[in-house]
Amino acid sequence: MSLWSDLGADLRAKQRLYSTPEQVYPLLRTVLADGTLANVLYRIQAMLVRWHLGPLALIPHWFNKVLNGCVIGVYAQFGPGLVLIHPVGVVVNSAVRGGRNVWIESSVVIGENRGQFPVLGDDIFIGSGAKVIGGVNIGTGARVGANAVVLHDVAPGDTVVGIPAKPLPRRA
């Protein structure tokens, strides 16, 4: 993917938050919202990595850390539709792989444990303060509740909560 197509998908995904009748200028609101600058800096970082300019990717990485309090590893990969709702305190390891339409709230940690790294499917939501640690797979359509600590795989479509995270019963 390209910088513009990924960033466009990110903004369209985020715009869904602001597409209500009372929002006169949802695109402007989206561009000025918390997390948009973090998304832009991450996408520039990812573009530089794709162009084999990894050392230069440290520049937007640094700006993201300083301006947004958000650390997304230089080699972390996310598909289009990434939404950083409130980026402060977000830490993502460089080896993490995420699919399309991953939504991340504030103070989320997605990181390594004993050389193992998480893999996130498509259409994932990770709530504020959640921790996703080690070689876990988060299935497509899964939701991780606020402050959950995920140490084991999450099945597609499941919602997990708690410490350690356990799935909620599915609604009939």
For the regions a protein language model found, what residue spans apply to each?
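Terminal amphipathic alpha-helical/low-complexity segments used for targeting or macromolecular assembly
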Residues: 1-68, 172
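Left-handed beta-helix
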Residues: 68, 73-74, 79-80, 85-94, ...
